[in-house]
């Protein structure tokens, strides 16, 4: 007699539990405005040779100290050059596979990105001299934590 009602009631409770959990969960996708702000901040800091602002975009919680030093150095290489183009782009399946892998650090310890990437920042820099013009392209993964976009620095792998 209560078999059908029990199944229906259980289904309603599951739907309510999922809805309640979803309502309190943080959004995992950055808004277009947040993405623009991140890209604009990076571009302005890079072109202005503002290392402090570039370093403030690094997610350093739990970061391996040597990896952090490397990332700080890499974010400032070429500072002051003209950014020809800069964009946050969706990850390809290959990017996701690469980001999920542990990698050996300088001292041989295994490291992983400290945040799961949601996009990658692709920066094309143009350097002009009296004799020539050259361009270079760099890519870096971008993750999200507490509603903010970050460049995740590798941390010790679990």
Residue ranges of each PLM-predicted region?
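A detector of low-complexity, intrinsically disordered, Ser/Thr/Gly/Pro/Ala-rich segments
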Residues: 7, 29, 125-127
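Positively charged n-region of N-terminal signal peptides that target proteins for export
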Residues: 2-13
């Amino acid at each position: 007699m209560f078999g059908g009602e029990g199944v229906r009631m259980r289904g309603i409770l599951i739907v309510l539990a999922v809805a309640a959990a979803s309502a309190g969960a943080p959004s995992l996708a950055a808004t277009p405005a947040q993405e623009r702000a991140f890209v604009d901040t990076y571009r302005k800091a890079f072109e202005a040779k503002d290392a402090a602002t570039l370093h403030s975009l690094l997610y350093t919680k739990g970061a391996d100290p040597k990896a952090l030093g490397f990332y700080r150095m890499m974010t400032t290489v070429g500072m002051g050059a003209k950014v020809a183009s800069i964009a946050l782009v969706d990850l390809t399946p290959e990017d996701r596979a690469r980001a999920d892998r542990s990698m050996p650090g300088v001292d041989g310890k295994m490291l992983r990105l400290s945040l799961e990437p949601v996009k990658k920042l692709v920066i094309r820099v143009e350097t002009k001299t009296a004799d020539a013009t050259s361009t270079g392209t760099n890519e870096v993964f971008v993750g999200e934590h507490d509603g903010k976009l970050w460049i995740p620095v590798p941390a010790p792998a679990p």
